[in-house]
Amino acid sequence: MSPQTETKASVGFKAGVKDYKLNYYTPDYVTKDTDILAAFRVTPQPGVPPEEAGAAVAAESSTGTWTTVWTDGLTSLDRYKGRCYHIEPVAGEDNQYICYVAYPLDLFEEGSVTNMFTSIVGNVFGFKALRALRLEDLRIPTSYVKTFQGPPHGIQVERDKLNKYGRPLLGCTIKPKLGLSAKNYGRAVYECLRGGLDFTKDDENVNSQPFMRWRDRFLFCAEALFKAQAETGEIKGHYLNATAGTCEEMMKRAVFARELGVPIVMHDYLTGGFTANTTLAHYCRDNGLLLHIHRAMHAVIDRQKNHGIHFRVLAKALRMSGGDHIHAGTVVGKLEGEREITLGFVDLLRDDFIEKDRSRGIYFTQDWVSLPGVLPVASGGIHVWHMPALTEIFGDDSVLQFGGGTLGHPWGNAPGAVANRVALEACVQARNEGRDLAREGNEIIRAACKWSPELAAACEVWKEIKFEFEAMDTL
């Protein structure tokens, strides 16, 4: 190497390792309206200061790497780097901190949840300086929201398509989830829809197995729902699961569903992936299909309190990627969900503008501008005695989904559906009359039993069934 070359290499570049906090911890930074803001729950390794840990998260999820590189001089790191701008200790926890990070919008591809997550959570969670890391919330700026189509149709358009107003929608997951032939599966669908449900549903792992190939299932389910529609005079739907091993196969199934004339298809958005989900959502918008989303695999990501991604972030990501329904817990059933936290992300799914409210786990004010809303689906271990609480907790813009709570009725599927519909109508009427569902719920259900033998039988079967475990998802 010539002396001249050595001189040039030494100007403006000093090799070596620097503390992250020197460049990426900026407590004086004033966030911009266009920044994506993240709240991380950080547990540093012993001996690592919280400022260094927060700065490391900002660096490793944006422009930083473990050492200084000479190509840093070829761009403006101040323009593109993430910045840890605020740190606060977590009340009641040792060595846990909420670190707030701001990311410039130019770091992200427009309309791509895949790219957003690859940047923010793709690599940093394995960082050795951190004992644990959890993404608690994101603030998506309106300028980025507007690059997404979002849900194919949204709440109001769905109600107009179904011609159903003023109450929650009722659904049922067909059980057993695996093992039925396509014809017997279709028979169960017909009985549930004829009995008064609005929807029936493929379970998340019903795809195209040897005992029931997807095309056969689609045909028998379409026949069932059209027959139920003709008999009841109500529009019916069955969530036909289009999830597949490839995007091409997924789209083939969605196209076939559209050709059958059914109103709705389904996708497992986490196991299927955000790229596949967004592709399907765009197709559904263009072709008049509603899109039901199952969150299979979510608890692997969001169950631990100090590591992973909170479901409110996954819910926001789904609203951006696209879906008209998504499972959101029940508060009262067999699956995880603390009331205030659940209602926090339910509002993030449905409402246009949500204020910051730390008591419900909402770290940032979120403005969705014109992005359509998503119906939350309450499903998992619920039955007729839960109907007053579910109606009171979730309100009209929701789907209440009873699998075993329909199919487990002692008289069969159709009476099980009748029992759920009667219970729902009784609760909605009582609420509209000004009665307190939380206090008078059992009385309302017992009164309805007097004129519905199907409901009376259901109440007798499930009167002792409770799932009383402490929720792990707490503040």
UniProtKB/Swiss-Prot annotation:
Mg(2+) binds at residues 201, 203-204. GO terms for biological process: photorespiration; reductive pentose-phosphate cycle. The disulfide bond which can form in the large chain dimeric partners within the hexadecamer appears to be associated with oxidative stress and protein turnover. It comes from the Eukaryota. Its EC number is 4.1.1.39. It catalyses: 2 (2R)-3-phosphoglycerate + 2 H(+) = D-ribulose 1,5-bisphosphate + CO2 + H2O; D-ribulose 1,5-bisphosphate + O2 = 2-phosphoglycolate + (2R)-3-phosphoglycerate + 2 H(+). GO terms for molecular function: magnesium ion binding; monooxygenase activity; ribulose-bisphosphate carboxylase activity. Residues 1-2 form a propeptide. Keywords: Acetylation, Calvin cycle, Carbon dioxide fixation, Chloroplast, Disulfide bond, Lyase, Magnesium, Metal-binding, Methylation, Monooxygenase, Oxidoreductase, Photorespiration, Photosynthesis, Plastid. The record marks 334 as: Transition state stabilizer. PANTHER family: RIBULOSE BISPHOSPHATE CARBOXYLASE, RIBULOSE BISPHOSPHATE CARBOXYLASE LARGE CHAIN. Heterohexadecamer of 8 large chains and 8 small chains; disulfide-linked. The disulfide link is formed within the large subunit homodimers. Belongs to the RuBisCO large chain family. Type I subfamily. This is Ribulose bisphosphate carboxylase large chain.
